[in-house]
């Protein structure tokens, strides 16, 4: 029988079994390596209230904390919520990672330190 994908929709190579996790959206059991992962960094306060809080704040150099969340989606929820898209057969062979999104005002990241 023909193979549809090079990796059989799994990132496990040589492992017989991987622990399942639950989808963030629908709570379906998904193998850890098959789940689509998304790491979200958000401000705890929405953008509209940031200025109000900074004006009222006693500490002038206080930086509002951020919310760090790792989301795990099953394949169907990831497609439905447009985290990933359907790609053509030729496009599926393209293994380059998607371009990183950087906000316009963000400073460029410093290069890593040599060890």
UniProtKB/Swiss-Prot annotation:
This protein's record includes keyword Ribonucleoprotein: yes
Superkingdom of source: Eukaryota
Annotated GO CC locations: cytosolic small ribosomal subunit
Region listing for Disordered, in residue ranges: 86-115
Amino acid composition bias (Basic and acidic residues), ranges on this chain: 87-97
Protein keywords: Ribonucleoprotein, Ribosomal protein
Biological processes annotated in GO: translation
Gene3D superfamilies registered for this protein in UniProt: Ribosomal protein S26e (3.30.1740.20)
GO molecular function: mRNA binding; structural constituent of ribosome
Pfam families: Ribosomal_S26e
Entry keyword annotation includes Methyltransferase: no
Protein family (similarity comment): Belongs to the eukaryotic ribosomal protein eS26 family.
Name of the protein described by the UniProt record: Putative ribosomal protein eS26-like
Organism: Homo sapiens
Lineage, highest ranks first: Eukaryota, Metazoa, Chordata, Craniata, Vertebrata
Gene responsible for this protein: RPS26P11
